[in-house]
Amino acid sequence: MRYLIYLILTLHLTNVLANNSLNQNSNIWKDDWALADDFNMTIDTGGYSLPSEIAFINNPGKLPSDPLYFVLELKGKLKVVTNDRTVHTYSENILPLPQNLDRFDPVGAAGLCLDQKHGYVYVTFAYLDENGVYRNGIIRYENSPGRIGISPNSSTYFLDLFKDEISHTSHQIGPCVIHDEELFIAVGFGRIKNESQKLESTLGSIIRMNLDFKPLQDNPFYKNDNKIEARDYIWAYGVRNVFGMKLVGNRLFVTENGGGVDKFNEIIKGENYLYDGSDWSFAAKAEYLFSPAVGLVHLDRIGPDLSTFPEKFKDTFFIVSSGAPGGSGPGDHGDRSIIFFDYDFLENKLSSSPQHLLKFRGKSSQLPVSIEFASDGLYFIPMFPNSDGQSYVFRITYDINNNYPNKLINEINPKTLVSKYGCRGCHIINGKGGGFGPNLDNDLLARLYQRLNSEDYENKIKLLDQSENDLEIYKILRSNTMRNKGEDRVRSWLISFIQEPSFDNHLIKMASVNANEADATILADYLLKQKSDNKNNQKNNKIKVLISRYLPEPRYRHIIFSFISGIIFSIIILIIRLYFKRK
């Protein structure tokens, strides 16, 4: 028993030391996040546990003790941050019923929106009811009109509308937004995919009500029959899983998670968005599709009164991409990041392709989840602790003179570059890809070594160098290659080939991907390490397919469960080691 006490004291001391040394370790987290040029990122506040959303007060007071923004935590706490950056607990537990503390229940708080005029704070959530069934719900915290304090005066639950609907983790009730006296809320499809096509259920829909939870009579499916039903609340339906909502004037834009693809869309009153369980139906009405899926979460746009970013960003949407649940390390397809693109509000379409503002480059599991613009920058929340063990709210600012050390332009992840340059469109790499080009798995080094170090190849290069019409860059790349021998020549050749495929063969069919030398070097080193292991890959794939039949679809709850299980397992191992060391 005393070993357990020692362990608890040690963990507590470690936590205290970690908190006290925040300033000394202030640069560790920067290794986790790569940022675009002309931007800087700093820590605003810390000390959260699985934060899931941030929301700012529109017109905060000027005193140091006046509330500035709220941070919602997945497991039910709601915190408020004052101007002096003190973090207060606004509500200890937003859930209507006690949840089983003996197990990890994958339910929690999802959406957060504020109405300062009336002094309201709304939180959406999923919870286990008395029968152990997942249900959706909303709570409204009441403050004095015009002023939201650091603690509420009262609260009101709204549960009846959802009491007969079965929710589900990751497909639960989600974000909320307020326009004048109207409250919009997104509800995921739950467990049964075709629920999205039913007006008798709020599942898979956008619902609209007044600030007292009453349906609005101008809702498209409202029936004046003295009965309160789901159809009375529905604004649009046929959606799968909306994770982000943003009102621009009276127009409602959303980000939505699919199975294999995600989408950005505008929600129109009364529209059926056709989701019936397939990605084809999901994609039927989309303004922009992200393929493969990157886990789109919250989105925001700079308001007219927020001027910290330049004018060129005034019609730009910023979107958080959390990535595939269960993943760790940098995303291979641009996920675990913040994405932005320009939007033409007259033509109702994107006016630029998506680009990255921020990308995760850490080695651990991470889920970027929420952003919101304020008068002094873009605030950003990742759900899991960074490599220094802390959970922060970050602030991103536009600063052309910044000295932020970790920049996006210096990409170091070869898998990201494989995706960026579309290498798998033609080539098989690590068992995946197309078959139009040579397989890059099968002992590439050995295959190239013999050809590139042969007398025939050297004679071929001599003939090419005699040409007067050849591009100068080709001559430079050939010179770089031929000054090396053996494996060094193979590496140099591959770096040159990735930059300019025609540098030593003008008949080559491969098009240039415009890779720079730094990216080409990272790709070359990665490709030369690939091994031929097709039989093992096939065997492993069969095993994965067999196992996957008996496992649930991986979602956020599995990451959190694995995260907690890892901590518990580490503690058990440490106790065992202490016990045997004592013996």
Regions found by a protein language model. Name each.
Residues 552-579:
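Selective detector of the "anchor" transmembrane alpha-helix that sits immediately C-terminal
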Residues 43-76:
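Beta-strand-rich domains and repeat architectures in extracellular enzymes and scaffolds
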Residues 45, 409-429:
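Sequence/structural segment immediately N-terminal to covalent heme-attachment motifs in c-type
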Residues 377-379, 384, 398-402, 490-503, ...:
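C-terminal capping alpha-helices of c-type cytochrome domains
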Residues 134-177:
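Asp-box/WD-like beta-propeller blade repeats and closely related beta-sheet repeat scaffolds
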Residues 109, 430, 434-528:
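Extracytoplasmic electron-transfer domains, predominantly the class I c-type cytochrome c fold
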Residues 86-118:
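Blade-loop segments of beta-propeller domains
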Residues 20-35, 63-67, 72-75, 102, ...:
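Beta-propeller domain segments
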